[in-house]
């Protein structure tokens, strides 16, 4: 009992920080400025002046470690007043790029670079412990034109020169990414009629619907209309009031006893009340101390009660790999920076400043956007079975309460078994335009844990093959 009181005391005295970026924290790796990293490539002036061929030629990446795969990279200006620029890296499909769908990947956070997706999850390359690249067998660019954007501004290589350039809500996120996408399709006009999909994971549960909704709205009057067909969200935080419900889940896993569950539920109820009162910052702080505690001097309640430092996969109490460190070290090499046209621009894999500006956004729901988008596009919501931070039952909580035209049918829809060849990959449920999938033996980052199945998952969705 004394220990329980002490935990509550520690919880209260450290109750003043944020629900921080959930990605593994890579070690600091400085850029050696004495080496020649070239200069940043800003493509917007060339695009605006109609110099498309020149822009594309300059954006080509030429480096011995990536020469086996065609790719393009550079900066797209999304706000001239604040000099806000977004970094992109684009990989044309290996098979039939003229007709292959264009897939945008957005990482979570808020403030995590999409280079995590590229190098740790679904891009054509993996950074080895020797800081060299090897090909990924199940890269999504096998049959997709694959686009990575560091989002929001201030994340990864993307940057702004004015504090007012940082996004503070999902409207800003949607606007900036849409501005970048329009320029991307001006740079690659042959792809404008290809099917387009917005995808992402984790806090991408906010970004993906925000960008999709922005495309829908801007397409009404836009000169360049984006051919959006669908959106896919992996382990996404979309509807916090109905998703942040960990006590029962951790109890069922055996990571909490009944007392721990009750303590979790006490604070979760307080958090939900704060959300309902639209006290976004207070709710943010509460749930951070419940789960993360990353930027405080005290462990989170989750850490105190379970002993876990990790919430991406309940089979691991600590991060089992150093892959994010290898990625950062590779990207900080001057020859690499010169090749990808970023020069000496600062690389921030997990931006605290982006998180600070987005803090009031975190606990707000975008379920209403998901409900609207189901009436216009196909929607895929998938979860890894072993995740904790955005676990499958928590996603199912919000989907069961989602107010959309297929809501009643969804509640009684039959679940199907999903095989990849002879392998049992997971389970799916489809009602009208909405598909929900559980991926077996995968944690928070599904393509990292189950790359073969993840490729099958996204390919079935983008090629409308069903499960």
Curated annotation (Swiss-Prot):
The text of the family note is: Belongs to the peptidase S10 family.
- EC top class, as a word: hydrolase
From the UniProt record, list the reaction(s) this protein catalyses: Release of a C-terminal amino acid with broad specificity
Name the tissues where it is expressed.
Answer: Expressed by the venom duct.
Q: Which GO terms describe its cellular component?
A: extracellular region
The secretion signal range is 1-18
What is this protein's record name?
Venom serine carboxypeptidase
Active site, renumbered: 202, 387, 444
Q: Which SUPFAM superfamilies match?
A: alpha/beta-Hydrolases
Which parts pass through the membrane?
A: none
Native species:
Apis mellifera (Honeybee)
Q: Which residue positions carry a glycan here? A: 130, 169, 304, 322, 344
Q: Which Gene3D superfamilies match?
A: alpha/beta hydrolase
The main location class comes to secreted
Q: Which GO terms describe its biological process?
A: proteolysis
**Which GO molecular function terms does the record list?**
serine-type carboxypeptidase activity
E.C. designation(s): 3.4.16.5
Q: Where in the cell is it found?
A: Secreted
What keywords sit in the KW lines?
Allergen, Carboxypeptidase, Glycoprotein, Hydrolase, Protease, Secreted, Signal
């Amino acid at each position: 009992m004394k220990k329980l009181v002490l935990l509550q005391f520690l919880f209260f005295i450290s109750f003043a920080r944020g629900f921080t970026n959930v990605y593994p924290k890579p070690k600091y790796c400085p850029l050696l400025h004495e080496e020649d990293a070239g200069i940043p490539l800003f493509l917007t002036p060339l695009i605006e002046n109609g110099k498309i061929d020149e822009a594309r030629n300059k954006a080509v990446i030429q480096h011995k470690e990536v020469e086996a795969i065609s790719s393009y990279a550079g900066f797209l200006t999304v706000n001239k007043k604040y000099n806000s620029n977004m970094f992109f890296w684009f990989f044309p499909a290996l098979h039939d790029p003229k007709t292959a769908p264009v897939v945008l990947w957005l990482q979570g956070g808020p403030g995590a670079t999409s280079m995590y997706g590229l190098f740790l999850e679904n891009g054509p390359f993996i950074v080895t412990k020797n800081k060299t690249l090897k090909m990924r067998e199940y890269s999504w660019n096998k049959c997709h034109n694959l686009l990575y954007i560091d989002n929001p501004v201030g994340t990864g290589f993307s940057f702004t020169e004015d504090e007012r350039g940082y996004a503070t809500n999902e409207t800003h996120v949607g606007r900036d990414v849409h501005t970048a996408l329009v320029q991307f399709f001006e740079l690659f006009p042959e792809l404008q009629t290809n099917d387009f999909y917005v995808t992402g994971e984790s806090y991408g549960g906010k970004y993906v619907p925000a960008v999709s909704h922005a495309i829908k709205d801007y397409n009404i009057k836009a000169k360049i209309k984006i051919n959006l067909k669908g959106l896919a969200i992996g382990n996404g935080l979309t509807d916090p009031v109905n998703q942040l419900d960990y006590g029962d889940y951790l109890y069922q896993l055996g990571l909490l006893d009944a007392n721990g569950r009750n303590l979790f539920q006490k604070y979760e109820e307080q958090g939900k009340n704060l959300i309902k009162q639209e006290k976004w910052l207070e709710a943010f702080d509460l749930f951070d101390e419940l789960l993360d505690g990353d930027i405080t001097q005290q462990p989170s309640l989750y850490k105190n009660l379970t002993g876990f430092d990790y919430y991406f996969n309940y089979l691991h109490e600590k991060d089992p790999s150093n892959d994010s460190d290898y990625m950062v070290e590779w990207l900080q090499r001057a020859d690499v920076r010169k090749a990808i046209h970023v020069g000496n621009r600062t690389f921030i894999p997990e931006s605290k400043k982006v998180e600070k500006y987005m803090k009031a956004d975190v606990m707000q729901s975008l379920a209403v956007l998901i409900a609207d988008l189901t009436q216009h596009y196909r929607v895929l919501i998938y979860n890894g079975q072993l995740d904790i931070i955005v676990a499958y039952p928590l996603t199912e909580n919000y989907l069961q309460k989602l107010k959309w035209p297929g809501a009643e049918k969804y509640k009684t829809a039959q679940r199907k078994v999903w095989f990849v060849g002879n392998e049992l990959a997971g389970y799916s449920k489809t009602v009208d335009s909405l598909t929900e999938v559980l991926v077996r033996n995968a944690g928070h980052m599904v393509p990292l844990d189950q790359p073969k199945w993840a490729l099958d998952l996204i390919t079935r969705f983008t090629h409308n093959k069903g499960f």
